[in-house]
């Protein structure tokens, strides 16, 4: 099913980009996703087969009247197809297309203590050189199991410079001998 969400997101991104509204559509999708997080009433409504198309459209018009036309059109299609519950994952895929277009990526930096903004900037600069991305959107997560050092995750790639990893590698080398 994820293929469907990605196709919706890609089509939405292409249309929004052509109309020059891809940034505001991304912001709207982020807000929509945050607003729907844990909203059981929305998902019950969205997945209820008894709810008519007219009620779904009325909901979309009343709730999302302030969003750009490409997003309103997608919401209308999702209402017709009874797929409004796909919105959160469509938002995620849209963000992936947006990031790819802007040559940027999310980066999670795990460390034993919270890093300062200067430290995160330095780490970001080093990884920008290493990865070729124009921009890294960095999130710092405290993880005391690392013992020391950092573990950075960009997309599906993990760069592990933690003391815990070094100890694990050392232990493996002892077992080989």
Swiss-Prot record:
SUPFAM superfamilies in the record: N-terminal domain of the delta subunit of the F1F0-ATP synthase (SSF47928)
Stretch forming the signal peptide: none
Subcellular location: Cell membrane
InterPro entries named among the record's database cross-references: ATP_synth_OSCP/delta_N_sf, ATPase_OSCP/dsu
Primary location group: membrane
Molecular function GO labels: proton-transporting ATP synthase activity, rotational mechanism
NCBIfam families for the chain: ATP_synt_delta (TIGR01145)
PANTHER family in alphabetical order: ATP SYNTHASE DELTA CHAIN (PTHR11910)
Function comment: F(1)F(0) ATP synthase produces ATP from ADP in the presence of a proton or sodium gradient. F-type ATPases consist of two structural domains, F(1) containing the extramembraneous catalytic core and F(0) containing the membrane proton channel, linked together by a central stalk and a peripheral stalk. During catalysis, ATP synthesis in the catalytic domain of F(1) is coupled via a rotary mechanism of the central stalk subunits to proton translocation.
Protein name: ATP synthase subunit delta
Organism: Macrococcus caseolyticus (strain JCSC5402) (Macrococcoides caseolyticum)
